[in-house]
Design a protein with these regions (language model features):
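Active-site-adjacent loops and short helices of periplasmic peptidoglycan-processing enzymes
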Residues: 1-87, 96-100
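Domain-terminus/edge residues, biased toward the C-terminal soluble/receptor-binding domains
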Residues: 67-68, 80-84, 88, 93-239
Length: 239
């Protein structure tokens, strides 16, 4: 694992060889500082020490949930053979956010990694998703969680946001980094969702208590018309 990651400028949670961690701690390590070694450790554990088997499991699961443009080639995303689309990233987030452990971890600003044989005391890891960090200029209270993905020159972000009881998923891919903004995908996500919440509202298109129309009745001795009501409520997103 460490031989593969060496020299790749991989993000890390400072997890060392021969340390012991729970899967929960490794989940936080993957989601907050994007710890590549944590992803590989989980893959090794879950697959019976076969990274290839785990990658095959990832691709099978992606296909099962409906991804059509995604191919995984490693557990952490460093390999350039990993590809996906905005639609597929949306599907992955929509499924992942349904798991309570994932949703809770993805929305945390920090986490205390436990003491171990390599760390005399617990230590703090911080999230790369600054949209959930109140101390950050990127902070947006409506963002509930998400995952960054970064290489040297660009950044991705997929996350979910809640306002007025409705939840929205956003995906920003291949946003170029600049000297002025090292987290451009977060900037673009914040601008996108600020605009969306200022521009669109969820409105009732159909209401079972409100008639759609009134129709005439030809053969009736008691009434000349009948009111038509929808069978179900329906909401829609309107500007």
């Amino acid at each position: 694992i460490y031989d593969y990651l060496y020299g790749k400028n991989a993000s890390t949670a400072d997890i060392w060889k021969d340390e012991t961690h729970t899967l929960r701690s490794l989940l936080y390590a993957m989601l907050l500082p994007s710890a590549n070694e944590a992803a590989y450790i989980v893959a090794d554990y879950m697959s019976g020490s076969s990274i290839d088997n785990f990658v095959a499991m990832m691709n099978d699961e992606a296909a099962r949930i409906g991804c059509t443009g995604t191919t995984f080639t490693d557990p952490c995303g460093l390999d350039p053979g990993n590809v996906t689309t905005a639609r597929d990233a949306y599907l992955l987030v929509r499924v992942a956010m349904g798991y309570d452990a994932f949703a809770q971890a993805a929305g945390e600003e920090s986490y205390q990694m436990p003491a171990s044989t390599k760390h005399d005391s617990p230590y703090t890891i911080l999230t790369s998703d600054k949209l959930v960090s109140p101390s950050s200029n990127y902070y947006r209270p409506y963002t509930k969680g998400g995952k960054t993905g970064s290489l040297d020159d660009w950044q991705n972000f997929a996350g979910w946001h809640t306002q007025d009881g409705e939840t929205y998923v956003s995906v920003v891919l291949h946003s170029p980094k600049t000297d002025e903004d090292p987290r451009p995908a977060l900037t673009e996500t914040a601008e996108l969702m600020d605009w969306a919440f200022a521009t669109f509202t969820v409105t009732a298109a159909l209401d079972t208590t409100q008639p759609i129309t009134e129709l005439p009745i030809v053969y009736s001795s008691q009434t000349d018309t009948v009111m038509i009501y929808p069978a179900d409520d329906m909401q829609t997103l309107l500007p």
